[in-house]
From Swiss-Prot:
This is Ribonuclease 3. Residues 174-243 form the DRBM domain. GO terms for biological process: mRNA processing; regulation of gene expression; rRNA processing; tRNA processing. Digests double-stranded RNA. Involved in the processing of primary rRNA transcript to yield the immediate precursors to the large and small rRNAs (23S and 16S). Processes some mRNAs, and tRNAs when they are encoded in the rRNA operon. Processes pre-crRNA and tracrRNA of type II CRISPR loci if present in the organism. Residues 19-148 form the RNase III domain. Belongs to the ribonuclease III family. One of its GO terms (molecular function) is rRNA binding. Its cofactor is Mg(2+). Pfam families: dsrm (PF00035), Ribonucleas_3_3 (PF14622). It is found in: Cytoplasm. Mg(2+) binds at residues 61, 134, 137.
Amino acid sequence: MPYRKHREKKYEAKYREAFKVFQEEIGITFTDEKLLIQAFTHSSYVNEHRKKPHEDNERLEFLGDAVLELTVSQYLFQKYPTMSEGELTKLRAAIVCEPSLVRFANEMSFGSLVLLGKGEEMTGGRERPALLADVFEAFIGALYLDQGLETVWGYLKEVVYPKINEGAFSHVMDYKSQLQELIQRDGSGNVEYQILQEKGPAHNREFVSRVTLNNEALGLGSGKSKKEAEQQAAAEALKKLKEQS
């Protein structure tokens, strides 16, 4: 057997074993293992192995992107029933953006499984953020095709959703949403807003709002609209709670 073919067979056996271990670690066994391998196959690897029936992960990445958007949207819709469309969109964008996907991929050691061409390997492709984000999306796409939406949901429940619950994306929320999330996380009770005062002429109104937690005042705020006053009250409440913790 020529040396090159022998080396390729050894490499193939090595990565198949790696994918077997990976499936054991995540507790999911693919019905079609080719889909799993394709999710981790970069175009540079396919270009160097043209005689073999390899497919790269770009189409799976396209599908995974849509599946991620849907599942994360559904989770946020259910978790934050009072959050506005604009805030939900902003929060979802923070969760599915490249740096977040890279973080998820790194925590699962996806980089070590990627099949790369030699040139891409030599230029540090395995650590390249865009590549890792693409692989995470492709994996979600492959998981969806092989196991369906329920398994994808279960996987994200282990890998992504806990980080939302821990407040990893709170910085992109408005003050009211941040406060609501903090209270939900701590299981402290119910937050309520009251408009205490409206003053000034119609063209220049000022509103004063109070936010309470279990009927205890947490913060006061004022603004040119009820919404602005409530946001300022929530900001004061957040500051107070952070000082106490």
